[in-house]
Amino acid sequence: MSFDSLPALPLDPLPDAALPTAPRRRQTVSVNVGGVMVGSAHPIVVQSMTNTDTANAEATAIQVAQLARAGSEIVRVTVNTREAAAAVPELVQRLADIGVHVPIVGDFHYNGHLLLREYPETARLLAKYRINPGNVGAGQRHDENFATMIEVAKEFDKPVRIGVNWGSLDQQVLARLMDENAAAGHPKSPTDVTIDAMIVSALDSARFAEELGLGHDKILISVKVSSAPELWQVYRQLAPLCDYPLHLGLTEAGMGMKGIVASSVALAPLLTEGIGDTIRVSLTPEPGAPRKLEVEVAQQILQSLGLRQFLPQVTSCPGCGRTTSSFFQTLAQKIQDFIRESMPEWKAKYPGVEDMQVAVMGCVVNGPGESKHANIGISLPGTGEDPRAPVYQDGKLLTTLKGPRIAEEFQELLEKYVEERYGQGVAQG
């Protein structure tokens, strides 16, 4: 068959409806969490949580600072004992002393009604209270204890997150819905009933909080499970039923690669549907691994979806038989680390630097092309190629590097480019 006999392909542009667009956010109210605005009118917020004993204010302050400097915009701490509650003022002061100003959220289970009343200064300093309606108390005490926490929130003008978890669901609500389901003509599966119970628990708690006088714009909701399909189901059912901001995350994502993949798979579909106003990636840290990894993964999920831009994107090839060594991989990692370490200073001095594109390529096949498309890029020599590395800036050849200091010289060129390209707005202002 000759190519001439093949049917012509349509070259008409796709209709607008078929073109990919940024997801339209589900409309929600705006909630102020210690100066960070959460809701559909604002960027999706990255949260994290410490794993230190909050009673150890020094260790907790160190970890909060690490998380905040990595880019966490809200940090949650466990408040589970009197010692932990008593340590919150010291924690906040330690953070202020080192110039870290990030909203601190108190995570309460079982005894939050007692701790918030006994430690009013802690209640005043926390930016938000997380309340789990599944473990605030049983029977009459459930409503009494919940009401106490809401009264404290009203007194100190604080928002609350009604945080329902699959593993600690209100058993009274679940039992009632299970009984109703058993009597139905076409009963649902236990999983579906459990998801219904999570939604009922969350919305009933939110309505009760409003009946107690808490403002509609003081409430956020989460309904967390530990698997992606159930997370999609519960949030897709919940989203049309309210306009409270929703916090997304798996309860337990797992460790390492498994946790990163599970969180990415779970969150991405909802975020692309416009569901979700804050996110947390709940990774189990590997031994010796920094806690801040959960922040970096959350940022990368949002950045990969085009929902936020946190730091310049480094494009690098995976490597193949054409590459002479792993040098380009080492350089790509060095540049990525250099950018992340530099971002706190760059973000303050150079507006727009987070949109910069950097390319670190390993051979002549795609290297020059990718480097030209980036703001600044380097194409390292592959097997059999001339041992020189051309550097492209804004699509044009800037210089050619060679010798043992290629990495250091490219880093210097990158820093100079940032100063010249993104420092103009500062100089003009």
Curated annotation (Swiss-Prot):
Superkingdom, taxonomy of origin: Bacteria
Cofactor: [4Fe-4S] cluster
Gene Ontology molecular-function annotations: 4 iron, 4 sulfur cluster binding; 4-hydroxy-3-methylbut-2-en-1-yl diphosphate synthase activity (ferredoxin); 4-hydroxy-3-methylbut-2-enyl-diphosphate synthase activity (flavodoxin); iron ion binding
Pathway field: Isoprenoid biosynthesis; isopentenyl diphosphate biosynthesis via DXP pathway; isopentenyl diphosphate from 1-deoxy-D-xylulose 5-phosphate: step 5/6
Positions of [4Fe-4S] cluster binding: 317, 320, 363, 370
Enzyme class: oxidoreductase
Catalyzed reaction equations: (2E)-4-hydroxy-3-methylbut-2-enyl diphosphate + oxidized [flavodoxin] + H2O + 2 H(+) = 2-C-methyl-D-erythritol 2,4-cyclic diphosphate + reduced [flavodoxin]
Keyword NAD carried by entry: no
Cofactor annotation comment: Binds 1 [4Fe-4S] cluster.
Keywords, alphabetical: 4Fe-4S, Iron, Iron-sulfur, Isoprene biosynthesis, Metal-binding, Oxidoreductase
Record keyword 4Fe-4S present: yes
UniProt EC number: 1.17.7.3
Listed PANTHER family: 4-HYDROXY-3-METHYLBUT-2-EN-1-YL DIPHOSPHATE SYNTHASE, 4-HYDROXY-3-METHYLBUT-2-EN-1-YL DIPHOSPHATE SYNTHASE (FERREDOXIN), CHLOROPLASTIC
Function: Converts 2C-methyl-D-erythritol 2,4-cyclodiphosphate (ME-2,4cPP) into 1-hydroxy-2-methyl-2-(E)-butenyl 4-diphosphate.
Protein name, as recorded: 4-hydroxy-3-methylbut-2-en-1-yl diphosphate synthase (flavodoxin)
Gene this protein is translated from: ispG
